[in-house]
Amino acid sequence: MRRSMPSTASILAQLKAKADQLTDIFIKELASLAPELDLLTPADPDRRGSQVSFRFPEAYAVVQAMIAKGIIGDFREPDILRFGFAPLYLRHVEVWKAASVLGRIMQSRDWDRPQFKARAKVV
């Protein structure tokens, strides 16, 4: 007997549910690991999509410190850290790792090193 393929709507709903889980994990982990980050993204998953943004005065340096540790975030002027969550290939464990790395960077103030504050022409 042949199994029927899931509908497009079903697949999209599964992807949305996973994206919500990934962003929820990231937001909740950072609420305790890095409370100095000001969450800009709506807490309601139906209003936030698959990205999470925080405000922090030294956002550029934080993103550079994360890149040095292999975690790619996005910087937006003047002080925004932005992270995208692709549910097709990102795993929950990778989100926990990213939150942990960001938490350690914030707690250790690793971002406050000169090499992370030097602005590149293109980011």
Question: How does the language model describe each region?
Answer:
Residues 7-10, 58, 94, 111:
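Alpha-helical structural elements of signaling/regulatory helical domains
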Residues 65-123:
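PLP-dependent enzyme catalytic core of the Aspartate aminotransferase-like
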Residues 7-55:
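Conserved small-domain helix->loop->beta segment predominantly found in fold-type I
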Residues 42, 55-57, 76, 84:
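Generic beta-strand/beta-sheet core signal
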Residues 1-6:
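Short glycine/serine- and small hydrophobic-enriched flexible loop segments
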Residues 55-60, 89-92:
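Helix N-cap motif at beta-to-alpha junctions
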